[in-house]
A protein has these predicted regions:
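Low-complexity, flexible helical/coil segments
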Residues: 54, 75-79, 92-101, 122-129, ...
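Small-residue (G/A/S/T)-rich helix-start motifs and N-terminal tracts that mark the onset
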Residues: 1-82, 86, 158-234
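Conserved phosphate/ATP/ADP-binding segment of small-molecule kinases
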Residues: 99-187
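Glycine/small-residue-rich loop that forms an oxyanion/phosphate-binding "nest" at active or ligand-binding sites
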Residues: 69-118
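Residues that cap or flank secondary-structure elements
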Residues: 20, 68, 95-96, 152-153
């Protein structure tokens, strides 16, 4: 599965449009180039939809969100939906502010997402949004210690991810010490990460960009593509 999905990516060299944060934009661009994809970053509302129309995947990341980015994300997402282009959302720190919560709620309402890549605290925050519950505690953009996906908590996190995937009709990629990838029916658990990955900024953002590329290159096997991206990243 991994070798096939990666071979498809390198053969097709998909163009990935990322509306992403300025902390990790260069890292994401270089990672896409390294894996065989082609990056383009365009966040101005006047061109975002046009760029998406020429791309093979759309990666939306709210890490450095501002009010100008929201219409760009919505316009690009609508264009992607109209053209059948996969859309991945990385809801960075969604529980940290009302702007982030409101933006993610609007994106979930107005766009058809292919996948959401998030840590456990972000997934829980989205689940609360979908249930119209008050926002819970936040650790900024990091997962709270009690939310980390460990072997001991694996079952409850698989259940959470599967329920959200089924409700939203998209793939949920819940990342942490153990990574969970699910479409609501089947769940894949991946154990090849390393504790040092939590000591740098941008690993999640890079994985989101990489996953968008894998989804673009493997349109008929999205779950396998998402799992392959996580395996590749570690």
């Amino acid at each position: 599965m991994l070798s096939t999905c990666l071979a498809n990516l390198r053969e097709k060299s998909p163009l990935v449009h990322s509306i992403t944060n300025f902390v990790t934009v260069n890292d994401c661009a270089n990672l896409l180039l390294a894996c065989g994809a082609r990056p383009i970053m365009a966040s101005d509302p006047q061109e975002a939809a046009e760029i998406t129309a020429a791309a093979d995947a759309l990666n939306i990341n709210i890490g450095t969100l501002n009010h100008l980015l929201v219409p760009a994300m919505l316009d690009a997402g609508r264009t992607a939906n109209r053209l059948g282009i996969p859309v991945l959302l990385d809801p960075v720190g969604v529980g940290a502010s009302s702007l982030r919560r409101q933006t993610v709620a609007q994106l979930l309402k107005e766009l058809k997402l292919t996948a959401i890549r998030a840590n456990a605290s972000e997934i829980r925050a989205i689940a609360r949004l979908e249930q119209a519950q008050p926002s819970g505690p936040s650790a900024g953009v990091d997962a709270l210690p009690d939310d980390l996906v460990t072997k001991e908590q694996l079952g409850q996190n698989i259940k959470l991810a599967r329920q959200l995937a089924e409700k939203l009709g998209c793939i949920i990629i819940l990342t942490g010490p153990v990574d969970i990838v699910t479409d609501g029916k089947k769940a894949v658990c991946i154990y090849n990460g390393h504790p040092m990955m939590s000591r740098i900024t941008g690993a999640g953002c890079q994985l989101s960009a990489l996953t968008a590329a894998f989804l673009a290159a493997n349109p008929d096997s999205s779950l396998d593509a998402a799992a392959a991206a996580v395996c590749t990243m570690g």
